[in-house]
């Protein structure tokens, strides 16, 4: 891991911490301590001077005014503004006294350079397109181009995979590798991700940083899976683990055309990974997202109910909303639909029957027993219409009409809390004016 922190304004401690935190969250580990580019300026400068000694780079003493004049002349001729190499073959002894030079590389003047890119295929540029770029500024600080190449070499980097907006840089970096006689890494320039409208991904498309996806309730393994599928595939496999990905992935299979970020598809992949995820882990992620302290009883309830909860949710945010079924205690408020269901004479009648039947279940408080008790009431009093019993039961237990399978939820809540919720519903109905005949 290398932190390219030479831009002091952007590389605040907070920004660097965010990178380390996001990588850790995504499960992307690294060997050795991170290398900080800014701490290696002396090493970078040493290589720039070595290139001068090898005759592959030179001191340039041009003043800012001279460079400005060159730009204007080139523009007047309708050419690209670039340095005219006036110091390339000049004797540094003729330099103005006290002038501080920059070091520039000697780019080849003719011929062409080809890079065998792992994603783009062979890419060739005319060397006349390459300029004698600056390697070391007059204050002895290295440019990004030099720093990157020296660091790649010293770290033993074998593959450089990055956005295709860096393709031009690869040719300039290859100049430095070649001039030092170093191995050039394999380059793979991957297309940039576009938004759903086909434009380059930007803030207006929504989430971009790992933290934003995390806040949306996306699991890291789902984000990894989804991002890997953007522009790369393995047959018809949509959902896979990191272990499978590591076995299957080949950089040469990446599409050279841009992919579109599809948030619906991401949620679909996330829903799958939630079903695969460990229930205890999901419960703890959910609790962390909700904040606040939760005691062991409520946590145990949430873990017990997680299998059914996660089957319905697409994100942790949705899961956190549904989790209140297990995290609250009676009495609690009923939403509009639940209140309408309970505020009914038949429902009041059913609720008493449910209460009496479940109170008799004793120790064997299981979903199958609960369901058969409710079915008996429906058969005896409502001509087998199960909804007449299940709907008020769901309203009383969940406080809302959408919930996981409710008999199983009752088993997870346990007899004591289930009875408390039924009692609270009966009190609420009584206050609405439904007396029991």
Regions found by a protein language model. Give the residues of each.
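Core structural elements
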Residues: 246-274, 311-315, 384, 394-400
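Active-site cores that bind ATP or allylic diphosphates and position pyrophosphate for catalysis
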Residues: 58-189, 195-201, 209, 234
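Conserved phosphate-binding loops in nucleotide/dinucleotide-binding enzymes
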Residues: 136-137, 155-166, 194-226, 230-238, ...
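Charged substrate- and nucleic-acid-binding regions of tRNA-handling and nucleotidyl-transfer enzymes
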Residues: 365-429, 433
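N-terminal Rossmann-like or analogous alpha/beta NTP/dinucleotide-binding catalytic cores
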Residues: 1-79, 168-182, 222
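Short, conserved secondary-structure transition motifs
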Residues: 39-43, 192-197
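Small-residue-rich helix-loop
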Residues: 279-382
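Residue-level signal for inorganic ion chemistry
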Residues: 19, 51, 55, 105, ...
